[in-house]
Amino acid sequence: MIITQMWHFYVTRVVLLLLISILPGTTSQGESRRQEPGDFVKQDIGGLSPKHAPDIPDDSTDNITIFTRILDRLLDGYDNRLRPGLGDAVTEVKTDIYVTSFGPVSDTDMEYTIDVFFRQTWHDERLKFDGPMKILPLNNLLASKIWTPDTFFHNGKKSVAHNMTTPNKLLRLVDNGTLLYTMRLTIHAECPMHLEDFPMDVHACPLKFGSYAYTKAEVIYSWTLGKNKSVEVAQDGSRLNQYDLLGHVVGTEIIRSSTGEYVVMTTHFHLKRKIGYFVIQTYLPCIMTVILSQVSFWLNRESVPARTVFGVTTVLTMTTLSISARNSLPKVAYATAMDWFIAVCYAFVFSALIEFATVNYFTKRSWAWEGKKVPEALEMKKKTPAAPTKKNTTFNIVGTTYPINLAKDTEFSTISKSAAAPSASSTPTAIASPKATYVQDSPAETKTYNSVSKVDKISRIIFPVLFAIFNLVYWATYVNRESAIKGMIRKQ
């Protein structure tokens, strides 16, 4: 009985298992796992299954990978301490300059400021490569991992490499191993000035650069586009207020020192000073001061205060102008063209003051009789016959009685020309009284007031003529010299 029940239990269990296995919608144990959300994302990208999704181009990724491997291969074993062609050939560095701004120029410090794009090109056999691109633009950080020329500026006082917002440097590598290295620089360079012709002077401000350590047997420099086109100045690049940029001359020099001979590249920028400012500030005031000093020649010689004021004021004015003209110049030991002009103007002004002193010294400031001395006039008065009546010490003029005062005669007091004329034309009864005797000279014998000195008459002509001749010679000399210098620069 028990065996029969166990048999039915096993048969029933087997039948149930068979029924479960054949029912639809059922899964096996390996497929019974529920699908995760991540599985859906992996299978559905943008509404498409992976087998229908578009292919992503991988050219850029391939180029980056290729050039990364190329650079790694080039820099592997590369020694940036050794120049290209060491022991075999001389390294040639080709250069050119683009000037973005020129100026300002400092006369007192004798220096100028220039902002340039400085380009250098050289060939390095170790950096040849073969890739999908012929020219490979590189980051400026790579410049520290390869050899670069040790170029420096011989006459540079201070040079600044711009670093905002990143270092302003450009590095390009050509597949044949040629490199282009460009940087933006602001250079403060010396400009030796010879101020003998100031302010009509012309200067040649040099810019010199070359290798610091390599002699001409190792590194040489040359101009990339020749001497005519290797240095270019932007049309709006002038930052000059007192100068005109006439042009530039490019050249090459060899300098010798105790360590060897070096190649030096030179560029001379020719500057011409603008004279307008100095004409207004110095030349015109000097000319007007000289003319003002010569006005005193037209004042009468008796106007001592007026002529003294003219002379002293003009001398002090010229002194002030000469001091102010030197403030904008370095303290040079020689005289400039402006110094000579101011000195001559000062001489004219001072001579006008000396001329007045001479006239005032040799001219009588009195009303004395012309051609006769006072004692002679008194003797003539004594010899005149007097009336037998009682001596009267008065004389009558136009019905008025005046006492005769001989003390005033001894002090050179006379009657002016304006008073002498009506006295001569008056009636005899109005001139003299029978009680007195009055001695009267003719109008021709009376000294004239406001008389003009012969020295003043000559000075009115000599001084203006000499000053005009000086200006003619001065300006003609320096204008012709300026034209000759400009012509020479154009030829160069």
Swiss-Prot record:
It comes from Mus musculus (Mouse). Disulfide bonds join C191-C205. Belongs to the ligand-gated ion channel (TC 1.A.9) family. Gamma-aminobutyric acid receptor (TC 1.A.9.5) subfamily. GABRA3 sub-subfamily. InterPro entries: GABAA/Glycine_rcpt, GABAAa_rcpt, GABBAa3_rcpt, Gabra-1-6_TM, Neur_chan_lig-bd, Neur_chan_lig-bd_sf, Neur_channel, Neuro-gated_channel_TM_sf. The modification Phosphoserine is found at S426, S433, S442. Residues 31-42 have a biased composition (Basic and acidic residues). Alpha subunit of the heteropentameric ligand-gated chloride channel gated by gamma-aminobutyric acid (GABA), a major inhibitory neurotransmitter in the brain. GABA-gated chloride channels, also named GABA(A) receptors (GABAAR), consist of five subunits arranged around a central pore and contain GABA active binding site(s) located at the alpha and beta subunit interface(s). When activated by GABA, GABAARs selectively allow the flow of chloride anions across the cell membrane down their electrochemical gradient. This is Gamma-aminobutyric acid receptor subunit alpha-3. Residues 296-305, 358-457 are cytoplasmic. CDD domains: LGIC_ECD_GABAAR_A3, LGIC_TM_GABAAR_alpha. The gene is Gabra3. GO terms for cellular component: chloride channel complex; GABA-ergic synapse; postsynaptic specialization membrane. Keywords: Cell membrane, Chloride, Chloride channel, Disulfide bond, Glycoprotein, Ion channel, Ion transport, Ligand-gated ion channel, Membrane, Phosphoprotein, Postsynaptic cell membrane, Receptor, Signal, Synapse, Transmembrane, Transmembrane helix, Transport. Glycans are attached at N63, N163, N176, N228.
